[in-house]
Design a protein with these regions (language model features):
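Non-catalytic helical/linker scaffolds that mediate oligomerization, partner binding
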Residues: 1-473
Length: 473
C-alpha cells in the first residue's frame, strides 16, 4: 500500500467522466478545487462527481477547497499583452485605467501606500522585476529592471513589503461558506502570514458549526517567520513553493521545505508539498529526471502528500501524471524502508495516547506485524500513529464518514467505515473480519490493535493489544 498521499487538482482537463474515473483508479487520494479558477457551479459539479465515484469504488476520498486569498494582481490591458523594456518606466496605479506599456491598474487599493522607494515589485511569478522610484499614495512609478511580456491579471509579488491586505477577502468568505455547504473535507488558506489568519477562518467555521480541517499555505516570508505559531493553530500545512520561491531567494526553498516538513511532523500536522512537482507533464507525457528526484526527495523529507496542480487541472496528460507520481512514491517508500532513511520522530511522549502510539510504532518495528488497526472517533489516534511513520499500514476504523475522508490526507492511513461499536471486543472482532475479508490481512498474521475505553469517547486512546488474526468467524 502506498503511504504517501496524492493530491490532484481538478479543472478543464479532468472534467470528462472517463478522465475522472481514471484519476480515481490511478490512486488520487484527495481532489483539490482551486477557488482562483472556475465558478462555484463548476466546483459543485466536480464535487458531485467525486462523491459518485466514491460510492461506486467504495473508497473514501477527500475534497480540498483552496481559497484564493489576498492575491495582488494587475488589471487588464487595452490592446492585449504588452512588452516592458528594460530601464523603461512603468506606473502601477490604484485608479482604474486601461493598461498600456506605460501604466496599468492593480486590484489592491493600498498598493501605492504600502510600497516605498527602492522596493522590488515582481510581476508574473517573478518573470519581470521592477523597482519603485516614487509613490504618491495613489500610483507608484517603477523602473523596469528586467522586462518582458505582461498581460491581463498577472500576479504582483512584493518581497519584503508588509502588505495590509486582509487574510480573508469577501470572495474567500463566500467560497468558504460554499465549501461548508457542499461538504468539502479541507479548506486551504492562502498567503498565511500569522496565526491569527488561521483563527479568523476557524472562527468563521465555528460560526457555521463546521469542523473542516484548515491547511495553512506557507508562501510568504512572514508565514515562514511565524511558522511555529501558525502550526499551533492549523491542522496541516502546504509548502506552496510557487509564491514562496518568488518572494524569497530560490536557493533557500529546498531547506525551507525540509524545515517546514520536519516541524509539521513534530507537531503531528499533515503536510502537503506542492507546486511544479511534475511541471513538464503539462505538455510532455514523461517528467524530467529532476522532477522525479524532486518528488522522491519530498517523500524522503517526510511529507504526508505530494500535489499536482496544472499538471492535472490544465495539462495534456493528467492521468499519466498521477500514475507517474504513484510509481515514484511506491519506489521511494520501498527504498526508505530498506535503507531506514525515514526514522520515527524522536520525541518525549506527553500523554497516554502518545505513549500508546509510541509503543504501537515499536511493536510494528520489532514484532513482525503486518498492520496497525486503530479504532478512532475523531481520527486523532490515527494521526498520532502516522506521525511515527510506521513501516506497516495504519487501518483506521471509524463510524464517521467525514473522519474517514479527513484521514485521506494522512500518511500511511487507510480509513474504513464501520458501524457504531460499544466494546473493544466487538471492535476487534469486526476489524479482524474486515481486514481478512478485504485481503488486508490473513489468518495467522500479527496485528497491533489500538483503541480507547470507554469506546466512542474522543481522546480516550489508552489500550494496545498484539493480536494474532484468527480468520473470518
Amino acid at each position: 500500500m502506498r503511504a504517501t498521499k496524492i493530491v490532484a487538482t481538478l479543472g478543464p482537463s479532468t472534467d470528462a467522466d472517463a478522465v475522472m474515473r481514471a484519476l480515481f483508479e490511478a490512486g488520487v487520494d484527495v481532489f483539490r478545487l482551486n477557488a482562483s479558477h472556475g465558478t462555484q457551479d463548476d466546483h459543485a459539479r466536480r464535487i458531485k462527481k467525486v462523491r459518485e465515484l466514491e460510492a461506486e469504488f467504495k473508497r473514501h476520498s477527500g475534497i480540498l477547497l483552496d481559497l484564493q486569498g489576498p492575491k495582488i494582481r494587475l488589471g487588464t490591458f487595452k490592446d492585449g499583452p504588452q512588452f516592458l523594456k528594460d530601464e523603461s518606466v512603468f506606473t502601477i496605479t490604484t485608479e482604474r485605467v486601461e493598461g498600456t506599456a506605460d501604466i496599468a491598474s492593480t486590484s489592491y487599493p493600498d498598493f501605492a501606500r504600502d510600497v516605498k522607494t527602492g522596493d522590488s515589485v515582481l510581476l508574473a511569478d517573478g518573470a519581470l522585476h521592477l523597482q519603485v522610484i516614487e509613490s504618491d499614495g495613489v500610483a507608484a512609478r517603477c523602473r523596469v529592471v528586467h522586462g518582458g511580456m505582461i498581460s491581463d491579471r498577472k500576479g504582483i509579488n512584493l518581497p519584503g513589503v508588509k502588505v495590509s491586505t486582509p487574510s480573508l477577502s469577501k470572495k474567500d468568505v463566500a467560497d468558504a461558506h460554499f465549501g461548508v455547504e457542499q461538504g468539502v473535507d479541507f479548506l486551504a488558506l492562502s498567503f498565511v502570514r500569522q496565526a491569527r489568519d488561521v483563527l479568523r477562518l476557524r472562527h468563521l467555521l465555528e460560526d457555521a458549526e463546521a469542523k473542516q480541517p484548515i491547511i495553512a499555505k506557507i508562501e510568504k516570508p512572514e508565514g515562514w517567520q511565524n511558522l511555529d505559531s501558525i502550526l499551533e493553530e492549523c491542522d496541516g500545512v502546504m509548502v506552496a513553493r510557487g509564491d514562496l520561491g518568488v518572494e524569497m531567494a530560490l536557493e533557500k526553498v529546498p531547506a525551507i521545505q525540509k524545515t517546514i516538513i520536519e516541524k509539521a511532523r513534530a507537531r503531528g500536522r499533515f503536510v502537503i508539498t506542492a507546486t511544479q512537482m511534475l511541471e513538464s507533464m503539462i505538455e510532455s507525457p514523461l517528467p524530467t529526471r529532476a522532477e522525479v528526484s524532486d518528488v522522491a526527495n519530498a517523500i524522503h523529507d517526510g511529507t504526508s502528500a505530494v500535489m499536482l496542480s496544472a499538471e492535472t487541472s490544465a495539462g495534456k496528460h493528467p492521468i499519466e501524471a498521477v500514475r507517474m507520481m504513484a510509481r515514484i512514491a511506491c519506489e521511494t517508500e520501498t527504498s526508505i524502508q530498506q535503507q531506514g532513511f525515514l526514522s520515527a520522530w524522536e520525541t518525549q511522549a506527553q500523554s497516554i495516547p502518545e505513549i500508546i502510539a509510541d509503543a504501537a510504532y515499536h511493536c510494528a518495528r520489532t514484532a513482525g506485524v503486518v498492520a496497525l488497526a486503530v479504532g478512532t472517533t475523531s481520527g486523532s489516534s490515527a494521526r498520532l500513529l502516522a506521525r511515527y511513520r510506521p513501516p506497516v499500514p495504519v487501518f483506521a476504523f471509524t463510524s464517521n464518514e467525514n473522519v474517514a475522508r479527513q484521514l485521506s490526507i494522512v500518511y500511511g492511513v487507510d480509513a474504513i467505515v464501520t458501524s457504531g461499536m460499544t466494546s473493544t471486543d466487538q471492535m476487534l472482532t469486526e476489524m479482524e473480519h474486515l481486514l481478512v475479508s478485504t485481503s488486508r490481512a490473513k489468518p495467522g498474521d500479527n496485528i497491533v490493535f489500538v483503541a480507547g475505553q470507554p469506546v466512542g469517547l474522543r481522546g480516550s486512546t489508552n489500550m494496545l493489544k498484539l493480536h494474532r488474526v484468527a480468520g473470518i468467524r
